[in-house]
Every structure is written in structure tokens, then in C-alpha cells.
């Protein structure tokens, strides 16, 4: 019995070490990318914001965990979720309030009163307010002692309102180009870009919200996507977008610092305050930099998570109406839960989704370089 327990402990230790190794590899990969970018592009300034935000984010998050435990800010696990998730019950949540502001503050300090600083301010507005919507949702969830805080309609209404204000600010300052670049073609859609912009912010923030279901999944994917966006911006227009690229990498660093404590087994969850803000920042940056196509490619995992839910609900409703009994295509959605119920290890799923995201980022960058 002692021998079997020792063997089990050794397996757990080996597994824990492999998770740490993956995160160190990710940190090293992004750091090298930043250094190379700063060397290659004269206007690039990625290394310093990335290192600063990673360090500060990890320190602030580490300090914040005991504070959350003290005031009993703990995750509520939904009853219909995978059974192994009940082991996560009581893990502190609302981590977004610690790491999201770090990326914003560092960006504002580095580029205060510089050219295009109004872009940083405008994006800071939408990110902070989406974080605040998430905070309200997290708070109400804890108050009700349920996994749901705001209703779907309430959340969509608040997101739509903030998105509309953001779009109006962008329109009055000509921050969003009225054309969309897809592959090598440019489509001028005029004022249609504004309703599209609202849709992008809603779709992206809800996709990131759905993706945040496994330890380190969203934070790790976000590090890669933010970095990919930064490099994409520099490739397309290194001289005019030197403000947006460091903002991307500052957000990547903030997510990276959080990931050190969000890795399996997570010591802290980001909550809706983190996931909604990440989605808003990705969507907002992609809109202003005209990289919606790049975001769609690099955020393939985010899109897949969201689409899996839409397909599942649609098939269930249609089959129930036609046959009188609802049928499911997936064991459970979002998509990561389907793979969980298939018997796959949580960290294996997370690492695989990171790898797919890395592959999609590389594909996008190759495409941009060749075009």
C-alpha cells in the first residue's frame, strides 16, 4: 500500500514538473520573440514591457491570493460540470482585478503624452469597463452562491453599452479604419465597421469567457495571441503602430505573470473580471490596428470553443422540436469539456490547445510576411 502511494506521489510530482516546464518554455519563447523583434524593428519596444508586466503581475497576484481567501472570494462550481471540477471548489477567483490593470498601467506609464496616446486611453477605457462588468458578475455569483451572477441578457446589455461608447469614441477620433483586410484583399465597408465593431467586442469577450474553463487554458492562449498580434502589427506597419504593439505585449506579460499561479493545479482563477477584459482588449486592438483577420486565425481555439456551444444548443433545440427529444453532438460544451469527459487529462488538453494556438500564430505570421 505504501509502495503504491509512493508511486502515485511520484507520478503527481512528474506531472507537476511537466506543467512547470511547459510554462517556462512559453515564457522563454515569448522573451526571445520580444528581443528578436526589438533587434529587427527599430520602432519595436517589446522586451521591457513584457518583462515588467510579467514580474509585477506575478507578484501582485501572489500577494492578492491570501487577501481573497481572507474575505472568502471563492469559486462556485456548477453542478452540471465535469465531476472532477468539484475538487476546485473553494479556489479563490476574481484574479482579473490583479493582473488586467497591470498591463494597462504599464502601457499608460510608458506612453503617457506620446504620439497616439489617445489610442492607449481609449483601449484602456473598454478593457477596464469590461473588467468591471466581469467583476459585477463574479460578485453577484458569490453573493448568490451560484455559478451565475448577471443574467445573459443583463451581461449582453452592459457589454453592448460599453462597446457602443467605445465605438463612438473611436469614430469621433477616426481611430478605426473603414476597411477590412482579408488575405491580400481590402474591402471598404464604410460605416458598417461600427456595428461590426460592436459584434467583434461581444463575440470576442464571450469567446474568451467560454474558454476560461481549465487551469491555465485562457491565460496561456492569451499570451500567445497577444504576442502574435504585437508582431503582426509590427510586420504590417512598424512605423505607425509602435504604440499598439507594446500594449499587446504588456497584456501578454500580465497574462504570463498570472499564468504562473493559474497553472494546474490553479491557486487562483481569473473569473469573468479577467476573461471579459481579455476578450475586449483583443477585439479592441484588432479593430483599431485592422487585424481582425489575424485575430480570427490566431484565436482559432477561442472561436472553436464558442462555435461548439452554438452547435450544441442548436442541434439540441432542433432535434427536440423535430423528434421530441434533444440530442447532443458533444458530450459537453465548451469544447474543452468534451475532451475532458473523453478521459483526457486536463493539463494535456491545455498544452494541446496552447500548441494549436502557437501553430495558428505562426501560420498567421508566415502569411503576413509572404503577403
Curated annotation (Swiss-Prot):
Transmembrane segments: 21-41, 46-66, 92-112, 119-139, 156-176, 182-202, 216-236, 241-261, 268-288, 296-316, 349-369
Topology versus the membrane: Multi-pass membrane protein
Main subcellular location of this protein, as a coarse class: membrane
Top enzyme class: transferase
Keyword Coiled coil included in the entry's annotation: no
GO biological process, one term: cell wall organization
Record field: catalytic activity: UDP-N-acetyl-alpha-D-muramoyl-L-alanyl-gamma-D-glutamyl-meso-2,6-diaminopimeloyl-D-alanyl-D-alanine + di-trans,octa-cis-undecaprenyl phosphate = di-trans,octa-cis-undecaprenyl diphospho-N-acetyl-alpha-D-muramoyl-L-alanyl-D-glutamyl-meso-2,6-diaminopimeloyl-D-alanyl-D-alanine + UMP
Any matching Pfam family: Glycos_transf_4
Keywords recorded for this protein, A-Z: Cell cycle, Cell division, Cell inner membrane, Cell membrane, Cell shape, Cell wall biogenesis/degradation, Magnesium, Membrane, Metal-binding, Peptidoglycan synthesis, Transferase, Transmembrane, Transmembrane helix
Cofactor(s) for this UniProt protein: Mg(2+)
One GO cellular component term noted in the UniProt record for this chain: plasma membrane
InterPro entries xrefs: Glycosyl_transferase_4, PNAcMuramoyl-5peptid_Trfase, PNAcMuramoyl-5peptid_Trfase_CS
Pathway: Cell wall biogenesis; peptidoglycan biosynthesis
Subcellular location: Cell inner membrane
Molecular function GO labels: metal ion binding; phospho-N-acetylmuramoyl-pentapeptide-transferase activity; UDP-N-acetylmuramoyl-L-alanyl-D-glutamyl-meso-2,6-diaminopimelyl-D-alanyl-D-alanine:undecaprenyl-phosphate transferase activity
Annotated EC: 2.7.8.13
HAMAP family named among the record's database cross-references: MraY
Annotated function: Catalyzes the initial step of the lipid cycle reactions in the biosynthesis of the cell wall peptidoglycan: transfers peptidoglycan precursor phospho-MurNAc-pentapeptide from UDP-MurNAc-pentapeptide onto the lipid carrier undecaprenyl phosphate, yielding undecaprenyl-pyrophosphoryl-MurNAc-pentapeptide, known as lipid I.
Family: Belongs to the glycosyltransferase 4 family. MraY subfamily.
Protein name according to UniProt: Phospho-N-acetylmuramoyl-pentapeptide-transferase
Protein source organism: Prochlorococcus marinus (strain NATL2A)
